[in-house]
Amino acid sequence: MGRWFRHVAVSILLSSQLAVATHAQDSQASSLRGVAIIPHTIAAEMKYRRERDPVLSARFQLFINGPAEKFKLDGREPDELLAAKEWAWHDFANAPAVPAGALGVREFNGATPRWGVGQQFELQADTFKATIPIESPQSWISSVTFLANDAKQLQPNRILLYIRNEAIEPLRIRGLRLWLPRAVSEWQNLWPQPVIAAESNVPAKDLGFLDLSVSPLPLTYAAVEVLTDKESLWTYLRIKKETFDISGGWIGKDLQHDAYLDLLASLHVDTGQIQEDDGYTNNPERYARYPIKSFNRMMPLEKFDTDEWLAKIHAVEFMGEPQYGGGRPVPPQEVREAFKPYRASRLATSVTHSEERVWRFYAGLSDYPHFDAYRVVAPAADAWRAYDRWEGPAPRWGAPLETIGDLTRSLRDLNRPMPVAAWSQGPHDGWSGFFDGRRRRSPNPDELRSQALHAISSRITSLYWFNLSLEGLLRFQDTWEPIRRVGRELHAIEPFLLAGDAYAFERRRTAEGRPDWDLASIVSPTAMLLFALDTAYVIDPAVNEFRFTPPRPAEFRFRLPPWLREPKVLVRIDADGAQDADWRLNGEHVVISGTYSGDAIFLVVSDPKIREEYLQRLGEARAKEAAYPVDLQALKALKK
């Protein structure tokens, strides 16, 4: 490996030339130590019934060295800026004074151009002032993931950090420091930990990573400071042990039936919108054989914030879809306040984002954001008839499948460096009837797989199927195998997804300008995943469903990261195994040739044993499926 790949920086978005003018430069005195700025973006490919709000603002994290309190911005109180609707939300209210020697983090999300790129503002405290320019970053952290080497270990002891450097020169890293609270209940005041030496470079116009083994970390909030040859880079986020979980949605009604649990287990479902369900969570033998993590309110905290429960909780989620709110959107500040009790706990919060048109104003509210969007015969925030990718009129029953990727990338970038998750459309029994010429009210197997892969290829760290109720599964039995295959593949590639980061994306069109392929890549320290997702699908007029055309010749070109530019193995992978592919190196790129349709996923490694580890995990997934045989007659009997 080159010297810049062993140790690389950690940060959230931050202008590489941030010039913070303060009246207290001594690092031990009151001062503004750093700023993380995440400019708002929109997914321009999305279409809506009414014109979207064009306002682009930014989200901020201010890192303040104490002693300091009584903060104002441009002479105004934070609540005044919220009331004036210049901000979407903030967390200045009820925050304690920052004591001497400690670090306090204050966050807010702008809602007007006044707080967008090209502006500046003055931060005032009782002990210092600082002028902060709002600039687009040249270098930023795109992901921070905390992992545990032992699956049974509650606290993570490994940190994966990726930083993208779009500057024209390398970024030199000198060290890393964590700032941690003295207790989980004191999460708002952070204290410095010893600096970890990390001399390295992030190449210009490229990505680098840092893979650190550390002592077990507390499940609380932390600031990360990276010392560089310029300013320190900063981020603030919750430390949570990351695992790739697969949810079945609202499955609690039938969890007392082993036949249903066998089916869910064979589909690799390990999470659900449950908390305590009679006949399941209070049945120790059943709960042990069919472990399903809870994804719910998880109150009272004194019961659920325990070592016994932590391993059985995916995340806290109870806000529904606040951007929709049942017709009354829930203001972002209300969402922030609803999650406040959990911030002094070890439980990570999650919120459902449902409308890209406005979700930038909700960015940063939870520890583990996710979104829901379904592309066929389902309620939707976007205007399906407005998409012009079709040769004829756009259907009312479906939207471009590839917009799932657009939505995933939007949510990911607005909330980085936190990991994100996605709901993906599965069989559903609740939407019935004849809809604009389409009788089938759930995705067909191809539509189901394509939507899931567009999210996965943009690097999510959990997938939630909507909705694997017993009724829906029995009604659409042809979805079982594609769900099972996606789950098997996810188990096999899980280490690369969790330890990785999104690297590149290209939307490719034909010479005539028609949709062709979406090309996406995810890199990790030991491997790279390449996704070629077919966007040349057509409408089957006989049934009004999307169909992929027969395999066609294709050539895919992917850029390799610096540490994987001499690969030893490149194979096509799927739920059945790994097959040789026709590939060649071309400078910093790999070129793959073949005949493909639907999707093609490739694994690139420098060490051949990584391929064998992939195949071993695939075998583990098959063994799990075999351990939970499905009894169709028993399932049908449950609904008689």
Tell me the role of every PLM-derived stretch:
Residues 33, 42-44, 78-97, 128, ...:
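Extracellular/luminal ectodomains and secreted, surface-exposed scaffolds of diverse proteins
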Residues 25-28, 105-140, 485:
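A eukaryote-biased signal for short, well-structured alpha-helical docking elements
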Residues 128-140, 231-239, 613-619:
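Edge beta-strands of extracellular beta-sandwich domains
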